[in-house]
Amino acid sequence: MAKMQSKMQSDKPDDGMREKMIAVNRVTKVVKGGRIMGFAALAVVGDGDGRIGMGKGKSKEVPVAVQKAMEEARRKMIKVTLKNGTLQHTVTGKHGASSVLMLPAKDGTGVIAGGPMRAIFEVMGVTNVVAKSTGSTNPYNMVRATLDGLAKMNTASEIAAKRGKSVEEILG
């Protein structure tokens, strides 16, 4: 067992990315000859500075499914601009029947979020945030809803550029 773990750790690329497993499900395909068992993994990867990616992996064995999920998450990363370790503004995200509300928080609040949302904020580098999920609690849908909301977030300078105003006018 120790040999296997040390081998798996040496295979990991040392690129400073934080990785978190969200879910591993055992899935079954029923065929004429019986049942074929497999595993589906859901993972998030982040750099601790606003980059975040989500990946799914499927395989007959758990470690292979996890590895595939991590690789896909590294390939599908998005950049989110943070503001002093929190979000720029209040934002909502939706995917399927899952909805999430994410609010910026002042220093000392911490990460107040449940389930898969907490893992996303931790690998992304968010230190202060309040988040609430409603509707479906399916981990896949919650992760997609959270990423949808984060992708919609704009900085004050982006909003000012769209409106043709100065940043001071936007911030009031």
UniProtKB/Swiss-Prot annotation:
UniProt entry keywords in alphabetical sequence: Ribonucleoprotein, Ribosomal protein, RNA-binding, rRNA-binding
Domain S5 DRBM: 17-80
One GO term describing the cellular component: small ribosomal subunit
Superkingdom to which the source organism belongs: Bacteria
NCBIfam families on file: rpsE_bact
Gene name of the record: rpsE
Molecular function via GO: rRNA binding; structural constituent of ribosome
Domain comment quoted from the record: The N-terminal domain interacts with the head of the 30S subunit; the C-terminal domain interacts with the body and contacts protein S4. The interaction surface between S4 and S5 is involved in control of translational fidelity.
Stated name of the protein: Small ribosomal subunit protein uS5
Quaternary organization: Part of the 30S ribosomal subunit. Contacts proteins S4 and S8.
Pfam families associated with the record: Ribosomal_S5, Ribosomal_S5_C
A GO biological process held by the record: translation
Family in the record: Belongs to the universal ribosomal protein uS5 family.
Biological role stated in the UniProt entry: With S4 and S12 plays an important role in translational accuracy. Located at the back of the 30S subunit body where it stabilizes the conformation of the head with respect to the body.
TM segment ranges: none
Disulphides: none
Lineage, broadest ranks: Bacteria, Pseudomonadati, Pseudomonadota, Betaproteobacteria, Burkholderiales
Organism: Janthinobacterium sp. (strain Marseille) (Minibacterium massiliensis)
